[in-house]
Amino acid sequence: MITFSNLIDKFQEFAEDNYFIESFSYGSPSDVDLDKFELYPLLHVVYTGASYDGGNKVYNMEVYILSLPPSEADKNLYQKADITNAEQVAEDILADMKNGGNIFEFEYLYEVGSASVTPLEETQSNTLAGCLLDLSIIVPYQHNACVAPLTGVQPQ
């Protein structure tokens, strides 16, 4: 069974093995604090919830790929390069999920339901730039009552 924990472990493994990514975290978007991380680019995963459709569970995630420009960097040049690099990392994640399973390999079948990339540009309130990969991952879900940890309940 593929769980939220399994998915986070795979994203962390991807971040550790990727030559571009320097840090990994997960949690809410507000957890991305400039003072919290020393190394950038950062891959930050936000679990936005799941839905159940027939025999499937759909995990919805936001994957932030962010860099911190040097203070003297030319804003436009930096953002162009960083958005390009971050988008390539997002495409590497998708390619591994859809084609290879080098990192995102599980004993169970899954598929990418939808994916989109949004560029994130530096503003006055946020000096980070990169992209947001909005991702849904579809896994089989059987609504199996046999696995419920209920005292006194016998599986049928």
Identify the meaning behind each predicted range.
Residues 27-36:
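Short acidic low-complexity segments
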Residues 1-27, 46-156:
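Charged, amphipathic alpha-helical segments and their flanking helix caps
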